A protein has these predicted regions:
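C-terminal lobe and adjacent flexible extensions of AdoMet/dcAdoMet transferase-like proteins
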Residues: 202, 206-246
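Residues lining the SAM
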Residues: 105-107
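A short His-aromatic
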Residues: 110-112
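A short glycine-rich, Lys/Arg-flanked "PGG" loop and its adjoining helix->strand segment in the class I
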Residues: 119-131
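Class I SAM-dependent methyltransferase SAM/SAH-binding core
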Residues: 43, 50-92
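A short acidic, Gly/Pro-enriched loop at the edge of an enzyme's catalytic core
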Residues: 94-101
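Conserved class I S-adenosyl-L-methionine
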Residues: 1-37
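SAM-dependent methyltransferase
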Residues: 136-210
């Protein structure tokens, strides 16, 4: 996924200004405190440019951000010099110790196309979570791929950049291909240059997510849906801390 954001990283925050980061930060803080996590280390998997990471850092949590795009992380480091940001594949991440909680937002986990890699990600979460820790994440609902994105085209125009977003959904493989055509303004010439990036996400059903979590020794303790996004809070199942999983 690193190459996918090499150019888009420079305009990512501009086009994501409609994302409800404040709402997400408040909701995550509420979930953490509900489960007795008032401080300590929290891992943000797929942190991107670090907007949400910084908000939670400001709320008193010691954040670690992991993302596979060095370009995205360079922007994140500018926002928060006090947070540790690591350039790693989220399905193979390594930490120095355990964390109180793990979060993953903005359908980051849908970018993991292989279910075995997603299971491995869940197992790593199991491994690094403290015994009373929680994992808070979201994924796109199946209906978003099947009914909203499907084979539709979206576009947006800003002064500094514009994009055309083509979607191609493979119903058999459950893979959505995004072809992102960017028109970015060159500061020197004032002209717009065309760039293309390709992004891929997998549509996971609700039953698949539950089953993959179960394989990793995790269980859902809270779940709700809003705006075609599925929100989960999970914990390690009793007796299934990594090392005891069959």
């Amino acid at each position: 996924m690193a190459e996918q954001y090499s150019l888009f990283s420079t305009v990512y925050d501009m086009f994501m200004d409609n994302v409800p980061y404040i709402e997400w930060a408040d909701s995550i803080e509420q979930s953490l405190k509900k489960h007795g996590i008032n401080d300590g280390i929290v891992l943000d998997l797929g942190c991107g440019t670090g907007t949400l990471t910084k908000m939670l850092s400001d709320k008193g949590y010691d954040m670690i951000g992991v993302d596979s795009s060095e370009e995205m992380l360079s922007i994140a480091r500018e926002k928060d010099e006090n947070t540790l940001f690591l350039c790693q594949d989220i399905s193979e991440f390594e930490l120095y110790g355990t964390v109180r909680a793990v979060i993953s937002t903005c359908d980051t986990l849908n970018y993991i196309l292989d279910e075995e890699e997603l299971v491995n990600t869940f197992k790593l979460v199991n491994n690094y979570l403290e015994p009373d820790g929680i994992f808070v994440f979201d994924m796109n609902a199946p209906e978003k791929y099947e009914e909203v994105l499907s084979d539709n085209v979206f576009a947006e125009n800003r002064d500094e950049a514009s994009f055309i977003w083509d979607n191609f959904y493979d119903e058999d493989e459950h893979i959505n291909e995004y072809v992102l055509t960017l028109f970015m303004k060159d500061d020197k010439s004032g002209l717009y240059k065309k760039h293309e990036e390709y992004h891929y996400q997998r549509n996971y059903s609700r039953d698949e997510i539950k089953g993959l979590l179960d394989r990793a020794g995790l269980e859902i303790i809270e779940n709700f849906e809003k705006d075609l996004r599925m929100y989960y809070t999970v914990k390690v199942k009793e007796g299934c801390k990594l090392g005891n999983i069959g």
